[in-house]
Swiss-Prot record:
Source taxon at top rank: Bacteria
GO molecular function, one term: structural constituent of ribosome
Similarity field: Belongs to the bacterial ribosomal protein bS18 family.
The protein, known as: Small ribosomal subunit protein bS18
GO annotation terms (biological process): translation
UniProt keyword list: Ribonucleoprotein, Ribosomal protein, RNA-binding, rRNA-binding
Its job: Binds as a heterodimer with protein bS6 to the central domain of the 16S rRNA, where it helps stabilize the platform of the 30S subunit.
Keyword Phosphoprotein: no
Source organism per UniProt: Chloroflexus aurantiacus (strain ATCC 29366 / DSM 635 / J-10-fl)
Amino acid sequence: MSRSRASGRPRSRRRECEFTKLGIVPDYKDVKRLQKYLTAQGKILPRRRTGVSAKMQRRLAVAIKRARHLALLPVAPSHTR
C-alpha cells in the first residue's frame, strides 16, 4: 500500500459507486435506498461521504427531490419536544 508524503499514513482505497456496481439508476420510488443518502435532518449527503460518482450523485439528488415532492420522503424531519 502506498503512503502519502504529507502525513505518512496509508492512503485509503477509493470506494466504488454502489449504483454503478449494482448496475442500477437511483429511482424516486426506492425510498429505502434513498434514505441511506440523507442525514437525520433530511439533507442530502455529499459525494465524499457516500462514495457515489458525480453522475449518480446528480441523479440521486433529482430522485430525492422527486420523492420529497410526492411526499414519499419528508422535506423536513418531524421535530419532537
